[in-house]
Amino acid sequence: MSKKKIGGVIVSDLNHTNYGSCLQAYATMKIVQALGYDLTFIKYIKQRNVWDWLKITPGLMLSGGFELLDQKKKFKDDCKRYADYMSNQQIRLNATNAFKKQEFVPFFKEYKGYKSLCEGSKLFDAVFVGSDQVWRPFGFYSNYWNLNFVDDRVPKFSYASSYGVSSIPSIQHKGTKRYLERMKMVSVREMKGKEIVEQYSNQKAQVVSDPTMLLTSKEWLEFASHSHKETPTEPYIFCYFLGSREDIRKEAAKLSMHTGFKIVIMRHMDEYVPADETIGDYAPYDINAWDFVKLLSNAAYV
């Protein structure tokens, strides 16, 4: 008897360096496969014309587009201002891409253009989306993350999806109700997501664990054993910061002074943060997902 084909809309693309997203994708893949299903990562290559862009641009701008443009401008400015920033980011990107090419890409199925994506959905016994911040307002207009492309006859569900915001724009309320009510089952990873789902649709949402929590510590240690990176032999503090808050960086420095332990830090994860340059005894960039989990598991403090 052949395995049922499951399509996954999962944050797993190349050229992104978020380790959390990478580990969530890996855990999701392993769990679905362990349940006996044939998993395919559904990949959408957009092919939009000028008219397509004109139709969605107002919505994009009202859903975080201006902030995204500001982030892109800041990244370009920081690359010019700080000599090693771009080259170090490329080192990190190469490492994460190498992992994804080995673990994820063999299960990718690419669809070029929306029509092809819709037709491709008919090949699956079910399609799901998750986890991570797959329902951020900015991604609404792709009709990809919300599974609008999936044929009506194909069962759809979400696993541990997140909006990443406390509220969604009013312009998306009707569309949110529409895509949620097409799903057989909705699960989210936080209470705010549950509130949004139940406020704007007739669906009931279940709050579930992040997929990384579904693998055992033994499984994660086995995963980390694939790392060829040496970690410090003496006790160390591992720091992985998203955002630019200086207070948590100062607390890490205080802990280092109090314990005498050195700091291993992943600098400038989602933006250039000057404070990152003020702490850390070891700041590696050539770190893949296996190395990341190894650094976590061997640390005295995280």
Which residues fall in each region the model found?
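A conserved, positively charged/aromatic
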Residues: K177-R182, L296
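Aromatic- and Gly/Pro-rich donor/ligand-binding loops
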Residues: I6-R178, S225, R249
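Catalytic donor nucleotide-activated moiety binding site of glycosyltransferases and closely related
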Residues: S158-V165, V197, F241, I248-Y285
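Donor nucleotide-activated moiety binding/catalytic core segment of transferases
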Residues: A205-M213, S217, V273-V302
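Conserved donor-binding/catalytic core segment of Leloir-type glycosyltransferases
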Residues: K229-G243
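An anion/phosphate-binding loop that grips the pyrophosphate of nucleotide cofactors and donors
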Residues: F124, M183, A299
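Charged active-site motifs of nucleotide-sugar-dependent glycosyltransferases
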Residues: K5, P232-Y236, F261-K262
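A short beta-strand/loop micro-motif in the catalytic core of glycosyltransferases
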Residues: M183-E190
